[in-house]
């Protein structure tokens, strides 16, 4: 009699176990469902947060175009704060063409009147370069020097370029205490020289010099176009474009061409032995000023 209630209690316990497990399973299922619902609700807010995150400003840029920071006056100011003044930047234009001089420029910017929009001349339009050229000349110390094609033929393009850069620095009204030069090579100047690779895109003074050199050379090539018609100097500025190569083959080279550059050398071989006056050659516009050591100060 005593054992029967125990059995029934045990049976009751066994019968209640499935219900307990069932309720636990339901609770787990309900918890999982609510968790999924919560996560599905949270997902849109996360996506919204990502969508609202700050993105690089690309206004005005085409698809796939990377924004490039403009050169700054920061490194010049750091030197000025240490008492180093004047600080110049220098650069050249025209190392790659088949004809015309290398033109070098040196610029000392006024710390209080640094033109806005300075940049590597290659990243500017021709009209913008002209505008900045006038502004730089009106507010800064500027000097320009030329290395003629004859000097390039004699010394090679690198040495002629460094020579012109050095001349430009020494032609400044006030000799700088420090000069930044674009490229890998320091200059043999009477002041401290610092080479900066890609400097025309980093340092404002070099960017200004690149603009002065580019505009000065472009103007000179337009003058050469009048002296040597038919070569198209006014459009390609002496670079080896198809139009220029065709003119070389048709008219032959002038003394403004760099004799040891391959396309020019080939053109000379075709007319070897022909006197210069029979090839349409005229005098070198830059030979006298360069050999006389004159660097024009604008």
Curated annotation (Swiss-Prot):
It is found in: Cytoplasm. The keyword Nuclease applies. A divalent metal cation binds at residues 91-92, 182. Its main location: cytoplasm. Its EC number is 3.1.26.4. GO terms for cellular component: cytoplasm; ribonuclease H2 complex. It is an enzyme of class 3 (hydrolase). Pfam families: RNase_HII. It catalyses: Endonucleolytic cleavage to 5'-phosphomonoester. One of its GO terms (molecular function) is manganese ion binding. The keyword Signal does not apply. Transmembrane segments: none annotated. Endonuclease that specifically degrades the RNA of RNA-DNA hybrids. Belongs to the RNase HII family. This is Ribonuclease HII. It comes from Rhodopseudomonas palustris (strain BisB5). The gene is rnhB.
């Amino acid at each position: 009699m005593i054992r029967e209630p125990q059995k029934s209690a045990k049976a009751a316990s066994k019968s209640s176990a499935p219900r307990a497990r069932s309720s636990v399973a339901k609770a787990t299922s309900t918890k999982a469902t609510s968790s999924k619902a919560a996560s599905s609700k949270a997902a849109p807010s996360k996506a919204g947060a990502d969508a609202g995150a700050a993105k690089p400003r690309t206004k005005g840029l085409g698809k796939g175009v990377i924004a490039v920071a403009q050169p700054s006056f920061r490194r010049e100011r750091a030197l000025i704060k240490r008492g180093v003044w004047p600080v110049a930047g220098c650069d050249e234009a025209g190392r790659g063409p088949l004809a015309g001089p290398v033109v070098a420029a040196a610029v000392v910017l006024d710390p209080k009147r640094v033109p806005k929009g300075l940049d590597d001349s290659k990243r500017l339009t021709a009209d913008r370069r002209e505008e900045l050229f006038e502004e730089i000349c009106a507010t800064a110390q500027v000097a320009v020097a030329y290395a003629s094609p004859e000097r390039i033929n004699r010394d090679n393009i690198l040495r002629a370029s460094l020579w012109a850069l050095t001349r430009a620095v020494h032609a400044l009204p006030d000799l700088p205490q420090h000069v930044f030069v674009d490229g890998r090579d320091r200059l043999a100047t009477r002041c401290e020289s610092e080479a900066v690779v890609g400097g025309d895109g980093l340092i404002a003074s070099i960017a200004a010099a690149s603009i002065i050199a580019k505009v000065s050379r472009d103007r000179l090539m337009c003058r050469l176009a009048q002296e040597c018609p038919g070569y198209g100097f006014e459009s390609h500025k002496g670079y080896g474009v198809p139009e220029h190569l065709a003119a070389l083959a048709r008219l032959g080279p002038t003394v403004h061409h760099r004799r040891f550059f391959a396309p020019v050398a080939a053109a000379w071989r075709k007319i070897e032995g022909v006197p210069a006056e029979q090839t349409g050659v005229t005098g070198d516009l830059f030979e006298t000023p360069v050999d006389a050591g004159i660097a024009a100060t604008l």
